[in-house]
Regions:
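Alpha-helical membrane-targeting segments
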Residues: 197-219
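Conserved donor-nucleotide/metal-binding helix-loop-beta segment in metal-dependent transferases, i.e.
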Residues: 30-61
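A short secondary-structure junction signal
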Residues: 21, 32-36, 65-69
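Catalytic core and acceptor-binding pocket of nucleotide-sugar-dependent glycosyltransferases
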Residues: 65-205
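Short beta-strand-to-loop acidic/aromatic patch adjacent to the donor-nucleotide binding site
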Residues: 17-31
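Short, surface-exposed basic-aromatic patches at helix termini and helix-loop junctions that form
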Residues: 13-16, 21, 37-44
Length: 219
């Protein structure tokens, strides 16, 4: 991911004739992209979204060279990043690594379109908890004919995509992916009733896990 900001130059031959280019992770399920990435957004911003799992750049010689031409302003220098054997998360904010391209662009006064459109799922929880969004109870996703929605007890919110990083998920084999399906924290199915069953099993699992923790402390 550290080389992603340089893709505009690295793959310039492939980008001839295109107005924009981008990068994303492979553990995503996409919804209706153009509902969120409108013509107005594309023409107003040189970069759309600031996270590594989903970013779009204007395809111009100026923007494609940002990674090496913008002053680092105390953040990570691209030459050091490209020579490092460690992951520097250079394609995003990377505050824990010293600052990446998103931070560098901000410090240079380049505005990034960064509305919360995607469901970036927190890796530290078994249940779905979305970074930069409120906590929802019994959260799952519904995909239907090209649209992806976040669903909870009294909530329905369409999202650009959902990011299922570092998560093992069982998939029902009899799913019509072009029509509709549902995604629970560890299960994908075309039957909505199975989602309710999953939440009951999940609550039981959480109770058992809590009891084990209590027992280990008592001992």
């Amino acid at each position: 991911c550290d080389f992603r900001p340089a893709f505009g130059e690295i793959f310039s031959d492939y980008l001839v004739g295109y107005d924009y280019w981008g990068h994303c992770d492979v553990d995503l399920i996409w919804g209706d992209i153009r509902k969120f990435v409108t013509d107005d957004v594309l023409t107003k911003y040189k970069r759309i979204f600031s996270r590594g799992h989903c970013s779009i750049y204007e395809n111009s010689s100026e923007v494609n060279a940002f990674y090496r031409t913008l002053p680092a302003c105390g953040c990570q220098d691209w030459k050091n990043v490209f020579q490092s054997e460690k992951s520097c998360c250079f394609d995003e904010w990377a505050g824990h690594c010293g600052g990446g391209m998103s931070q560098i662009m901000k410090l240079n006064g380049i505005e990034i379109y960064d509305e919360v459109c995607s469901a970036d799922i927190n890796v530290n929880h078994g249940k779905f908890q979305i970074n930069r969004m409120p906590k929802y109870k019994n959260l799952y996703f519904e995909y239907k004919e090209g649209k992806l929605a976040l669903k909870a007890n009294d909530t329905s919110r369409e999202v650009l995509c959902a990011h299922f990083q570092k998560r093992e998920i069982s998939v029902n084999k009899n799913i019509n992916y072009e029509k509709y399906f549902f995604i629970a924290p560890n299960y994908v199915t075309s039957e909505k009733r199975m989602i309710r069953t999953h939440f009951k099993e999940e609550k039981l699992f959480e109770i058992k896990r809590l009891m084990k923790r209590v027992q280990s402390k008592v001992r």
